[in-house]
Structure formats: C-alpha cells, structure tokens
C-alpha cells in the first residue's frame, strides 16, 4: 500500500486558511521552489512571498497567496505558518494592481519614510497576488 496523501495546514496570523488531505503542494522557499509529496523528508524552512499551489485528494487544484512564512514538513503532516494567507479566489485584483503601482512609485521616489528593501518587499507581495489571480483566471 502506498501513501498518496498527507494532511496540510495553512495558517495565517488571523485564522486557519486550509486544512485537508492533499496529494502535493508547491511553494517557494528561500533557496528555490519546493515540491512536497507524500513521505517527503522532514524539513523546516523559510518561504518567500508567493503562492502555494496544491492538489487536494480529489484532484482539485487550489492556489493560496502567502506573504512569506515558515514551512514545516513531518512524515504525514505539512504546516505552513504565514503572516498573511489569502485563498486565491478571495484576492481583489484592483487592489493588487494599485498595490503594485504604489510600490513601483515608492521605489522610484524613495524617501526617509520607506527604504528600498521595504518598497521591494511590497512590490514582490503585490506581484505574487497578481500571479495567483492570473493562474486562477487561466484555470477557469
């Protein structure tokens, strides 16, 4: 008998976003993309702002935006702890576009209130949200 699924928890500072059996997930760690399948080697790593791509036990694909956080892989349990996590279908495209434009403007016109690093992080978060929205539209 082979194990085909494991339990995934995605938790933000505000609430639990996802809890269920999945076949696999894909997420971006600090050293690159990670594909987590059943019986993956235990792992604890930081994850970058971006998306979690997951396939549920019934084959359904879902996308979750995360602002960064921690990924913990145990034998049959994977946990994502994120500062912010939003299901893809709950993202607001106009708001994400405005955030992107504001971040680009902040990078162009740096002042004492915001560093280049802060502005770059905000831009990365906005681009990640837009990527999730684009993937969801493409899947429909």
Curated annotation (Swiss-Prot):
InterPro entries: ATP_F1_dsu/esu_C_sf, ATP_synth_F1_dsu/esu, ATP_synth_F1_dsu/esu_N, ATP_synth_F1_esu_C, ATPsynth_dsu/esu_N. It is found in: Cell membrane. Pfam families: ATP-synt_DE, ATP-synt_DE_N. GO terms for molecular function: ATP binding; proton-transporting ATP synthase activity, rotational mechanism. It comes from the Bacteria. Keywords: ATP synthesis, Cell membrane, CF(1), Hydrogen ion transport, Ion transport, Membrane, Transport. It is a peripheral membrane protein. One of its GO terms (cellular component) is plasma membrane. Coiled coil: none annotated. Belongs to the ATPase epsilon chain family. F-type ATPases have 2 components, CF(1) - the catalytic core - and CF(0) - the membrane proton channel. CF(1) has five subunits: alpha(3), beta(3), gamma(1), delta(1), epsilon(1). CF(0) has three main subunits: a, b and c. Produces ATP from ADP in the presence of a proton gradient across the membrane. This is ATP synthase epsilon chain. It comes from Baumannia cicadellinicola subsp. Homalodisca coagulata.
